[in-house]
Amino acid sequence: MTKENVGLSIYFDNRMLRILLLGAISGFPWVIIGSALSLWLKDFELSRSTIGWAGLIFGVYAVNFLWAPLIDRIKIPFLTDKIGHRKSWIISLQLIILCSLIFWSFLNPVNNLEVIIFLGLLIAISSASQDITIDALRIEQISANEKAAMAAGASIAVVGWWTGYKIGGMLTLFVADYLEVVGFVNYWQLTFIFLCLLILLFNVGLLFIPEDTSNDRQKAQKKDQENFKAAGFSAWFISTIISPLISFFKKNGVTISFLIIGFISV
């Protein structure tokens, strides 16, 4: 058993930098569907009720746990074998966000509001889904017996989230304001292209984060399926939905588990 780091020195562990990056990747999409989308619609003098309806897309974050077991189970062709299960999902979902931003850059809110809101919903679903794998990858960075490091990692993840949100928001507003001042009419559309570049940088950094590529999770799922082989569809449901939930509650305890679920749903 390795000796745990104590005091402030634990925050200078290289793993904390990885967790900080993961937190920033998680928080950044909120800049897009929160700040950028609302201000974009406001600049076109759309009604407050319209902007309010656009805010409903955040509701997907409250229910992302419903498809968490599926994300844990389904592999991304080619990518999973090359870079790992967690990172392949994050990069795939980031690609959806990036493509949605590119589509936004060709649209006008006055004429294409429904399409813009749909793409915003797609970004929100991708963001909520990637949070599942980001949390899993973050937890894998620290051994289960390193309690102090685990607690420090949780706090750094929050700092990373706010860093991605605040710095991302600051850069977004700065770029949009600058482009407007120099005379670009489509300054928001060009700003979305700039955000695509930030997403690419995030993903380059993500590739340097190590991932546990052991097959323990797959072996456990296969064992569950074998135990319930005669049950047909029930086997898939139990190994994909029930077993991960049972494991989650066993690992964290009932109280902590419900607190985590409640925090995610806020």
Residue spans of the language-model regions?
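Central cavity-lining transmembrane alpha-helices of secondary-active solute carriers
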Residues: 50-77, 97
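Conserved glycine-rich helix-kink/hinge and helix-boundary motifs of the Major Facilitator Superfamily
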Residues: 20, 52-55, 80, 84-87, ...
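C-terminal ends and interior cores of transmembrane alpha-helices
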Residues: 76-77, 88-111
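Helix-loop boundary and gating motifs at the non-cytosolic
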Residues: 2-61, 122, 254-261, 266
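Intracellular loop-helix junctions on the cytosolic face of multi-pass helical membrane proteins
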Residues: 1-13, 99, 105-117, 129, ...
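Small-residue-rich segments within alpha-helical transmembrane domains of MFS-like 12-TM solute carriers
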Residues: 27, 31, 124-135
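Helix-to-coil boundary motifs at intracellular loop junctions of multi-pass secondary transporters
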Residues: 40-44, 73-74, 132, 137-146, ...
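Residue-level signal for discrete positions within transmembrane alpha-helices
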Residues: 27, 62, 124, 158-162, ...
